[in-house]
Each structure stands twice: as structure tokens, then as C-alpha cells.
Regions:
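Short amphipathic alpha helix immediately N-terminal
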Residues: 88-103
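Short alpha-helical "recognition helix" segments of helix-turn-helix
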Residues: 109-114
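N-terminal interaction/assembly modules
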Residues: 1-87, 134-137
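DNA major-groove recognition helix of helix-turn-helix
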Residues: 125, 132
């Protein structure tokens, strides 16, 4: 597996977190719609087909199910990453990879936390990628 393929595999966790965030924002939008409907209950006829409370509840339930599935998937990915990082058998490389791919820190932040220069962090990252064994199940 090339280093690019390894990076793609490693970034899956961040992608999963972004996906969860997107679903949570959508859920908030539906909650806002539900609040507006419950605030404006009226006998007056309206034009067009309005969303019913039942429709909104169904949609929100579907979104919550998606969020639960995505959270479960992200936890599985995180565990895969942690196992792969432990396989590096080097605490410094393991820490660097966790900061980068689990904590999603940028290079400047990693350099500060680890007490190294950014170029040295890049060098360690390259070494970690070379040593990293990815178990694609």
C-alpha cells in the first residue's frame, strides 16, 4: 500500500466525524421546523402542502438512526487506527499519529504539543507511514 493510500485510510476517522456533524446539523434544522409547526397551530386554511408533525418526527427518527450508525462506524474506525498505531512499537510515532489522525491536529499544533519543529514532525510522520501496517478487512 502506498503512503497516499495509507493516508486515505487514516483520514477515514475525520471524514466519519465530519459526516456525523453534518447529520447533526440536519437534525437541528428539522428540530427548528418542528418547533415552528408546534408554535403556529391554526384552523385557518393555508396554501400548499405543509409538513405535518408526523412527517417531521419520522424524518428526525431516520436522521437519529443515521447518526447512531455513523457514531458506531466512527468508533470502529478509531479502534482500527489505534490498533495500527500500537503496531508502530514507538511511543513517539504512535503519539504523533494519534494527534494527526484521531485528534485531527494540524502540524503547527502537533509541533507545539510534541516539542519538535514542524519539519521534524513531517519527518517522523514519513517514518511512521513507512512502518505502518494497515489491515484492510
Amino acid at each position: 500500500m502506498t503512503n497516499k493510500e495509507k493516508k486515505d485510510w487514516l483520514w477515514r476517522y475525520k471524514e466519519a466525524l465530519l459526516d456525523i456533524d453534518s447529520w447533526q446539523r440536519e437534525l437541528e434544522e428539522w428540530q427548528t421546523r418542528a418547533e415552528k409547526i408546534t408554535q403556529v397551530v391554526s384552523d385557518m386554511p393555508r396554501g400548499g402542502k405543509a409538513l405535518e408533525v408526523d412527517d417531521i418526527v419520522i424524518k428526525m427518527t431516520e436522521i437519529m438512526d443515521n447518526i447512531k450508525a455513523k457514531v458506531s462506524e466512527s468508533q470502529k474506525i478509531k479502534l482500527e487506527l489505534e490498533i495500527a498505531f500500537e503496531g508502530l512499537n514507538d511511543g513517539i510515532l504512535e503519539g504523533l499519529m494519534k494527534y494527526r489522525y484521531i485528534n485531527c491536529l494540524d502540524w503547527a499544533q502537533i509541533a507545539i504539543v510534541m516539542g519538535y519543529s514542524e519539519p521534524h514532525c513531517w519527518k517522523l510522520h514519513g517514518k511512521a507511514l513507512e512502518k505502518l501496517e494497515v489491515d484492510r478487512q
